[in-house]
């Protein structure tokens, strides 16, 4: 079902839908591990990839196929692959395209587990990793080598919301024809930016976050061109990680996507109001948000993003101790990691999501001990602000 000319909300609801035997409106959950062949010959043809069809849910399942079709349509890519987590998506992709002797250029500022994979995981298997500030294109250019296979980054970056010019970076990376640019689009989602349209080769997501949107699923997604997607499915996913998404979880994300556009509108609208509140508050030292004209990446964000997102990071006067006081006194906002849920979530990156970093590595990445990260939810914005206000009063 071709939906690329439809609006984003229509695409999220209708794209990739498969007809089924009973004509159900909701996508059925095909809760099966394996699929029956009509004959031995058919089984042989499917294993030889001479005939389309399902074999085993680790390789594909009708429910997950619909989700894969939807994310491919939303990102305007050729093919999607569903995984059991965001880290499963990242690991399966990297284990497909990398080998010993390859070189990776990545950013100093990454989600903590991604940083650990880059810093401690890949290097154990003979992959060289160089950490730079990817928003500084000269640093990227200077880090490139003949054996650079991957340039990997997030934008906006977790947790300080650094912005990278994807179009300019992709042009630099592709001066080496063997280099792939991989972008984690979890924070922005295809609601705000479509990296593949800006020259990026592969997009990865933690679908746990905004795409599902309800805090009840762990999942990851990859979108890229068909040939590369097939390699990731049949090498990285099938053989290297086995990070398979179950049909039940795929169903939840399919359902969550039906409200994707309207949820993102509310998330972003709430965030803009809260940024204005925090930016004027006397106990707040600094607010990090791409929609602020004072943000170093504001002009780039305005160019490549439809909106500025619903993630806010800020530092309080009084540093970490002030931050702990705030976190421990909130009533409505939930003290929890993750993001993109209907509930507003708040956490302390240095001691939580980014604890794999040493203090020196955090400082180099711009993750201070006093930084607080806020994932703005869908509650009435005046209630979120009232809770933040009473928490700040305790400092």
Residue ranges and their predicted role:
Residues 240-241, 330-338, 391-395:
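A common structural junction motif
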Residues 3-4, 12-21, 79-283, 288, ...:
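Conserved PLP-enzyme active-site core in the AAT-like
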Residues 39-91, 116-120:
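Conserved N-terminal alpha-helix of the aminotransferase class I/II PLP-enzyme fold
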Residues 119, 128, 142, 146-149, ...:
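PLP-dependent enzyme catalytic core of the Aspartate aminotransferase-like
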Residues 52, 78, 218, 249, ...:
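Short amphipathic alpha-helical segments
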Residues 1-61, 69:
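N-terminal "arm"/small-domain region of PLP-dependent enzymes with the aminotransferase-like
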Residues 17, 31-37, 187, 239, ...:
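Glycine-rich beta-alpha junction loops
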Residues 284-372, 376:
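Conserved C-terminal alpha-helix-loop-beta "cap" of PLP-dependent enzymes
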């Amino acid at each position: 079902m071709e939906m690329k000319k439809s609006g984003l909300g229509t695409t999220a609801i209708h794209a990739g839908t498969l007809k089924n035997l009973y004509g159900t409106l909701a996508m059925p959950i095909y809760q099966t591990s394996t699929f029956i062949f009509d004959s031995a010959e058919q089984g042989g043809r499917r294993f030889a990839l001479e005939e389309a069809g399902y074999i085993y849910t680790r390789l594909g399942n009708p429910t997950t196929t619909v989700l894969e079709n939807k994310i491919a349509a939303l990102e305007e890519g050729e093919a999607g692959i569903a995984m059991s987590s965001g880290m499963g998506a990242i690991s399966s992709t990297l284990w497909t395209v990398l080998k010993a002797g390859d070189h990776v250029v990545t950013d100093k500022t990454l989600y903590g587990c991604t940083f650990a994979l880059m810093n401690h995981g890949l290097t154990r298997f003979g992959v060289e990793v160089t950490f730079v500030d990817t928003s500084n294109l000269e640093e990227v250019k200077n880090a490139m080598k003949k054996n650079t296979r991957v340039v990997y980054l997030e934008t906006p970056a977790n947790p300080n919301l650094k912005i990278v010019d994807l179009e300019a970076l992709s042009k630099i990376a592709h001066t080496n024809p063997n280099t792939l640019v991989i972008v984690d689009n979890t924070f922005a989602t295809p609601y705000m930016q479509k990296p593949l349209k800006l020259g990026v080769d592969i997009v990865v997501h933690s679908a746990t976050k905004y795409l599902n949107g309800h805090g009840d699923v762990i999942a990851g997604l990859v979108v890229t061109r068909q040939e590369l997607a097939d390699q990731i499915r049949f090498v990285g996913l099938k053989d290297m990680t086995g990070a398979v998404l179950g049909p039940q979880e795929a169903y939840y994300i399919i359902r969550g996507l039906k409200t994707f556009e309207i949820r993102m509108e509310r998330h972003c609208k709430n965030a803009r109001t809260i940024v204005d509140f925090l930016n004027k508050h006397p106990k707040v030292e600094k607010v990090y948000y791409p929609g602020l004209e004072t943000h170093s990446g504001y002009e780039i964000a305005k160019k490549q993003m439809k909106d500025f997102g619903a993630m806010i990071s800020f530092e309080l006067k009084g540093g970490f101790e002030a931050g702990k006081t705030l976190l421990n006194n909130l009533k409505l906002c939930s003290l929890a990691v993750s993001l993109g849920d209907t509930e507003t979530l708040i956490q302390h990156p240095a001691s939580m999501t980014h604890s794999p970093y040493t203090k020196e590595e955090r400082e180099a990445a711009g993750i201070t001990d006093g930084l607080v990260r806020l994932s703005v939810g869908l509650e009435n914005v005046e209630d979120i602000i009232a809770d933040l206000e009473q928490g700040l009063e305790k400092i």
